[in-house]
């Protein structure tokens, strides 16, 4: 089957904005999923239903955007009512649009809109993608960030359970999430689609030869696990690495400059081009101690072939055994970070080809596309047989 010639039709339901300037890991993963489906089935055969308040000047005829909450009060009322991404009117219009379609696959790119999936009347194999186990995500927010997340905790849990009940297949980023979903909701048919990137590595020619100290890099947005982890690293590890310099890059991290910056810690924050900093860095650090799903920045660092020092949580879902302690180093304590960084990082460290090769073999999007296509075709075939049996 050639790309663009597929007769199958697909509906992609997104619970959040991801087309306009995707920056966080969830948005990047949603865009990856959407582009994968368009690559497999053809642009004209994939319908989009997305909840967003961004005003697009142009949309294709098969792309529909429905408004989400306008303010915090609407968000609170709707979440209490179990409507996590939109109000009653927007939900009704979205379901009307969905029910007007004739598709072979309903791909729900969020497990927190299970009630919408439940109320869809059209046929087609139903696949739910789990960015993480949202119930556990909300639990972590309650424990580490804000008690106000108790309301989403119950709403997410209810919708997630309904999503599993309404799905024919569930897709997870890693085996940990699959096992947790099975324990919580009794999921049966599943597939693992890990975080991937299209290979965008281009070595920059800028000369950094005047550097004296080795450069460490942390990339992450102003998100609770990132803040907690990098704050710990700056306070506990960097005083022991006074002959190193750490750059902190990521959306809105400049807001934490006063709190985090030291003589050997430079807070850059939001940047247009991350590749400049990846090419500058001798190594990447990922001190993430709690979270869910897979960490997108781990795959990104691998794409750039960076020697990486990361916690078990930051490496969750990644097969790194062939480069363990030969390019990717697991560190879970202050002592492990200090010892392994000192032993394995120097000024002007070159690209680690072994780390980059693992990315190209396992986490480059094209490598996973053929496997994912086979899974989707199998889903359609099995769903068709089930429908014939019911008749």
PLM regions with names:
Residues 168, 279-293, 304-306:
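Acidic donor-binding loop of glycosyltransferase active sites
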Residues 35, 92-96, 134, 149-170:
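Membrane-proximal helix-turn-helix segments that form the acceptor-binding/catalytic region
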Residues 1-57, 101:
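N-terminal subdomain of nucleotide-sugar transferases
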Residues 346-381:
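A charged, aromatic-enriched C-terminal amphipathic alpha-helix characteristic of glycosyltransferases
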Residues 297-303, 307-312:
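Short hydrophobic beta-strand element within catalytic cores of glycosyltransferases
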Residues 29-30, 194-261, 267, 271-272:
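Conserved catalytic-core segment of nucleotide-activated headgroup transferases in glycan assembly
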Residues 70-83, 127-158:
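Acceptor-binding helix/loop patch of EC 2.4 sugar-transfer enzymes
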Residues 161, 165-203:
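Donor nucleotide-sugar binding/catalytic pocket of nucleotide-sugar-dependent glycosyltransferases
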């Amino acid at each position: 089957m050639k790309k663009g010639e597929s007769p199958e039709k697909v509906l992609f339901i997104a619970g959040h904005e991801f087309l306009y300037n995707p920056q966080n890991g969830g948005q990047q993963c949603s865009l990856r999923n959407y582009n994968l489906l368009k690559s497999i089935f053809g642009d004209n055969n994939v319908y989009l239903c997305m909840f967003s308040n961004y005003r697009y000047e142009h949309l294709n005829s098969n792309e529909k955007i429905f408004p989400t909450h306008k303010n915090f009060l609407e968000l609170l009322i709707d979440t209490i009512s179990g409507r996590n991404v939109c109000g009653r009117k927007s939900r009704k219009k979205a379901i009307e649009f969905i029910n007007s379609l004739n598709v072979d696959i309903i791909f729900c790119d969020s497990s927190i809109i299970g009630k919408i999936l439940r109320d869809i009347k059209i046929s087609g194999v139903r696949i739910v993608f789990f960015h993480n186990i949202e119930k556990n995500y909300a639990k972590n927010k309650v424990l580490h960030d804000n008690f106000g997340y108790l309301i989403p905790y119950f709403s997410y849990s209810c919708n997630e359970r309904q999503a599993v009940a309404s799905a024919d297949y569930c897709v997870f980023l890693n085996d940990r999430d699959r096992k947790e979903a099975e324990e919580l909701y009794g999921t049966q048919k599943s597939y693992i689609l890990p975080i991937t990137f299209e290979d965008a590595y281009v070595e920059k020619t800028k000369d950094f030869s005047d550097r004296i100290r080795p450069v460490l890099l942390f990339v992450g947005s102003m998100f609770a696990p990132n803040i907690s982890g990098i704050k710990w690293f700056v306070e506990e590890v960097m005083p022991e690495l006074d002959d190193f310099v750490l750059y902190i890059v990521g959306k809105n991290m400049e807001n934490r400059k006063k709190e985090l910056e030291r003589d050997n810690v430079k807070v850059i924050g939001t940047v247009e081009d991350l590749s400049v900093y990846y090419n500058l860095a001798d190594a990447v650090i990922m001190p993430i101690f709690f979270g869910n799903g897979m960490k997108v920045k781990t795959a990104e660092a691998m794409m750039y072939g960076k020697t990486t020092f990361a916690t078990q949580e930051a490496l969750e879902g990644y097969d790194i055994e062939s480069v363990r302690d030969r390019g990717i180093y697991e560190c879970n304590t202050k002592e492990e970070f200090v010892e392994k960084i000192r032993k394995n990082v120097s000024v002007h460290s070159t690209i680690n080809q072994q780390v980059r090769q693992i990315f190209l073999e396992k986490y480059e999007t094209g490598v996973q596309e053929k496997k994912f296509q086979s899974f989707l075709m199998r889903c359609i075939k099995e769903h068709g047989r089930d429908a014939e049996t019911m008749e």
